[in-house]
């Protein structure tokens, strides 16, 4: 369900509504910031105020911030000639963040193990991938409604 009213508030990137989350007449609005992260308390209060002014009579609305799922990527790569370690690490991090931003708050869209591999392999400075994990596993990760993936760290090991 779309968080139409919440999206009208400054610094809101996306929002989801969960009807009847706590019984009849209740609605939970889950907010993602415009930077694809946890919104500030000021933003959440602005959403509450805006919805309170516009909501239907009788609806009890709860506004909360989205919940991050921390993501750590560890990868062993063969670096391309002419690239430094820090360049490769930065480009891999950027490519992964772009992917996570694209899937943030999309219903039924897991963090795909194979799409992370594509992003790593496509990053400037990477000639080949030896192995990689997401949070220590070689598996895709699912998110529940109101959750989003947040990159914590990219750990790179160079393979010769």
Can you say where each PLM-predicted feature lies in the sequence?
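Carbohydrate-recognition loop of C-type lectin domains
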Residues: 1-109, 160
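An aromatic-glycine-centered, glycine-rich loop/turn in mixed alpha/beta architecture
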Residues: 88-160
